Structure formats: structure tokens, C-alpha cells
Amino acid sequence: MLSRRQLIPIATKSVSPFLRSSITCRRISMGRKELSEKDSNILDSVIRVDQAGELGANQIYKGQHFILQFTDPKVAPTIQHMWDQEKYHLATFDNYVLKNRVRPTFLRPFWDIAGFALGAGTALLGTKAAMACTEAVETVIGGHYNDQLRETAHLENKAPEFKEIRSHLAEFRDDELEHLNTAVEGWNAKEAPAHALLTNAIQMGCKAAIWMCKRF
């Protein structure tokens, strides 16, 4: 398993989604074990969706940091810390995509733009609005990781790689919930203007993104 220090640079390298999409693999070879088609499809979905999700999160924090480093410098280190964790998450799933020959979502270019726009846009509304965005996103993603851990529980003993992936799912879930707590308890996210409207809209967008990445 690569360390965080080794993995973070991978996240900065862009591999053409068109090249990746040309790779087809109905059965994914995990080490020396051959998975069934059903298990391969589960693995494929987990990796594809989570890579896309971590890309979006990475871009959200990038957009927030781009604005808040100037408008509210005192929060910039907190944003940077959360962003660094998302870089590691993304690098981990980028590595899984390449290792397991998983086709990334066709929507990756869109998430690049949409994530940054969401991060920068909420930051322009102020620090509390940016933190409300974090609260909304991490609430959905934390629940999403919990769903995946339940969905893949029966696979853990089928191959060592499943145990490794599930350990990352649990680790990243805990990181996302830490971000949620930071936003709510540390930076008063719930005091953001139109908090309920903002967070509900963002959560609906996140759930729609997960649905689309599972299919495209």
C-alpha cells in the first residue's frame, strides 16, 4: 500500500478519461484471485464513484481556498488541511483505478468544473456559507461511505485487496465526518445565511452526482 506522501503527487497527474474509457474489463483480476462478474461490478462501481466523489471534493476545497485565502485568511489553514486530506483520498482512488483497470466516470471533466465553481461560489458568500457547503457535502459522503461498507461487507474475505479497499473506505469516512464536525462545531456552519436552503440544495446535488456516476 502506498503512503500518503507517495500517493498525493499522483492526484496532480491527469490521465485522459478517453484513454481510460477504452479499457474494458468485465472481470477484474485482484492479485491471483479471479472475481465473479457480480463482485467485479461491485468493485468497479465503488472505485468509479468514489474517485469521482473525491475529485469533486478536491475541487470544492480548491475553490474555497482560492477565495478564502484572500477574504478570510484565518480560515485558510483549516481549508488547506481538509484539502490535503482530499488530495490523499483522490490519489488513493486514482491508484485503484489504474491498478484494477476501472473505467472512470465519463462525467469527470464536468465534476472538475462544477466542484471548483461550488467551492468558490460558496466561499464568495462568506466563510459560514463555505462551511455550510462542507457540512452538506460531508454529510452525504459520510453516509455514502457507510452504505458502501455495508454493501461490501461480504467481500472482505474473498481477496486481500477487498480488505484494503474497505479499510480506506472506513478511514476516508472518518476523515469526512471530521470535516463535517469542523465545519459545524469549529466554524458555525449552521449560522450561514439561508442555511437550510443552501445545504438541502447541495445535498440533492451530491446525491444526484452519485446516482449519475454509478451509471455513467
From Swiss-Prot:
Residues the entry annotates as binding Fe cation 1: 54, 86, 89, 176
Positions with a binding annotation for Fe cation 2 = 86, 138, 176, 179
User: What subcellular locations does the record give?
Assistant: Mitochondrion inner membrane
> What's the short name of a Pfam family annotated to this entry?
COQ7
Q: Which GO terms describe its cellular component?
A: extrinsic component of mitochondrial inner membrane; mitochondrial inner membrane; mitochondrion
Transit pept. (range):
1-27
Mention one GO biological process in which this protein takes part, according to its record: ubiquinone biosynthetic process
Family matches, as InterPro entries:
Ferritin-like_SF (IPR009078), Ubq_synth_Coq7 (IPR011566)
Q: Does the keyword Cell inner membrane apply?
A: no
MF terms in GO: 3-demethoxyubiquinol 3-hydroxylase activity; 3-demethoxyubiquinone 3-hydroxylase (NADH) activity; metal ion binding
Q: Which UniProt keywords apply?
A: Iron, Membrane, Metal-binding, Mitochondrion, Mitochondrion inner membrane, Monooxygenase, Oxidoreductase, Transit peptide, Ubiquinone biosynthesis
Q: How is the cofactor bound?
A: Binds 2 iron ions per subunit.
E.C. number:
1.14.99.60, 1.14.13.253
**Please, which domain of life does this record's source organism belong to?**
Eukaryota
- Provide the catalytic activity annotation: a 5-methoxy-2-methyl-3-(all-trans-polyprenyl)benzene-1,4-diol + AH2 + O2 = a 3-demethylubiquinol + A + H2O; a 5-methoxy-2-methyl-3-(all-trans-polyprenyl)benzoquinone + NADH + O2 = a 3-demethylubiquinone + NAD(+) + H2O
PANTHER family, per database record: 5-DEMETHOXYUBIQUINONE HYDROXYLASE, MITOCHONDRIAL, COENZYME Q10 BIOSYNTHESIS PROTEIN 7
What's the family?
Belongs to the COQ7 family.
Q: How does it assemble?
A: Component of a multi-subunit COQ enzyme complex, composed of at least COQ3, COQ4, COQ5, COQ6, COQ7 and COQ9.
Q: What is this protein called?
A: 5-demethoxyubiquinone hydroxylase, mitochondrial
